[in-house]
Amino acid sequence: KTEDTVISFLNTEMTKERGSLLNVLKNGIEISNQKLNLLYRKPATTFNKEANRLYNENIFSVMEEVVISDKERIDLVIFVNGLAVISMELKCNHAKQSYHDAITQYRTERDPKNRLFRFKAGCLVNFAMDLDEVYMATKLDGESTFFLPFNMGNGTGIEAGAGNPIFKDKYSVSYMWEDILTKDT
């Protein structure tokens, strides 16, 4: 079956020693001398109608409560053309949870060998976030997983600090869906 052949080849390309999800997204794959592009980048201009048409054919999708094993589920996974590229653990400060809980969850409950989290072959980035702050890791490695802040910073000049600005009419992490998690970024 063609679909099974493509999936098998894709998995092989992403999991081999010098392979990666990023590489197959950037360069596509070749099967039986046929190039298969897995992502079309945004053209620099609108002059090339075909390049723009192909870019607009990319399919971005979001799944919530993605089951990754009998006992595990991830809050959100974002896909590009069917390939998982971002995982997110979301916590609500009002429920007395924070991004710290999401980081702990990634470090202690997520198996780095799981296909979704496998370094270079799984999601490109894993976000731990609450309503105020966002942290990211590109490699899950159990307790050794290192998370970096993915915040805008708060304040300006010598008053600048960590975290995000506080807004009256939206969440401090609204930049994630307004600016970061958009088709063009």
What are these regions (language model features)?
Residues 1-185:
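ATP-dependent helicase/translocase motor core
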